[in-house]
Amino acid sequence: MCIRDRFHTDPTLKKGYRIAINNDRADKVWWKMTGSLVSVRNLTKSFVKEDQWFKMDIRVAGQEIDVNINGEPVVEYIQPTAPYRTDANAYALLSEGTFAIESDGSGEIQIKNITVNVIDESTIDINAQLAEANDEQNDEIIKLHQSDFPVLDYHVHLKGGLTKEVAAKQSRKTGINYTIAPNCGIGFPITNDQQVMDYLNEMRSQPFILGMQAEGREWITTFSPETLKEFDYVFTDALTFKDNKGRRTRLWIPEETWIENEEQYMDMIVDRICSVLEEPVDIYVNPCFLPSPMDKRFDEFWTEARMNRFVEALAKSGKALEINELYNIPNKAIIMKAKAAGVKFTFGSNNVTPNVSDLSYSIRMMKECGLTAEDMYKPKVKI
């Protein structure tokens, strides 16, 4: 059951903003969890367990709406001069009015206390707020929220100077929810079960979904299955493997890609991808990556036969397919085939700097391939 707190509404409950109260992680609409400023800043992370008391603070000051859960900020939204709204959300605007609590399902609502405090508006610099607001008429992210599409970057790394504090602030500013994923494996920051648990104990209370990037092919024996289940999901790529001569290959490093015959090398890459798809992960990322200089002829090497073989193996594995922002892969043809095969999708920055993507390639592929909310992978969020 989803409960919504409306404010600045009227007796018919037709206008004003809505804040979601929904701790049901089994909900089919998994992108409107507690604290969501509905259809403006939808939240994919569940912060509170079911049947658990919590405190939610909603602050409206000038053009800014802030939502805190148990003292932690989850929404910081500034309504711009020209907000983008669909017809269905045309009245989701700041104005004046009353408060209401409504439910769209059956069940009991338990609320201990509701307190309203008046803010001294003379201390608010609305012009300064508006200067910080997003240009929503040219913002694809608000359009996703308005169309009821889950807005989640499933593949973000704390690297290149990006801290969890900066990432959280950036996420609230852009309206893009983040999954933070450490690189786990031999030669990477996390190399054993204890380090995984230490990391999760530190990060579980943060406003992110928590993923794991499984590195290399040795990761399966490096981490226990029980530890892997502590992540909200696990993903891997097929960029590291042994070639046909037994040499350790990392496809993004030219010195480790020994290409004698491009067609034969391409067949080997497809073989390795299909092998990786048998590993126990949830999402296949950096998909269909090709090394330089083959990457310049991506469509040429990914022939119909190779695409069909890959998509068949992917669909059989039950894994989701990432649409990757760093490399702008895979191409439309592969995405269309995967969609037809019933594969689920994720959007992923795979950032190497603090500048996390705006998901522009993913959104373009979403539009061109007709992806809907039902096509997106649902994380198994733990609290």
Identify what each model region corresponds to.
Residues R4-Q137:
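Carbohydrate-interacting regions of secretory-pathway proteins
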Residues V29-K32, P189-I190, D243-R247, N355-L359:
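Short, charged, surface-exposed secondary-structure boundary motifs
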Residues I119, C184, L239, F289, ...:
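Flexible loop residues that form catalytic
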Residues N134-S147, F298-I383:
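Charged catalytic cores and adjacent phosphate/nucleic-acid-binding surfaces used
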Residues D135-E218, P291-E300, R309-F310, G348, ...:
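An N-terminally biased module of ancient metal coordination in phosphate/nucleic-acid-related enzymes
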Residues H155, V234, N286, L321, ...:
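Conserved, mostly hydrophobic/aromatic
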Residues N192-K316, L371:
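Extended substrate/RNA-proximal surfaces in nucleic-acid metabolism proteins
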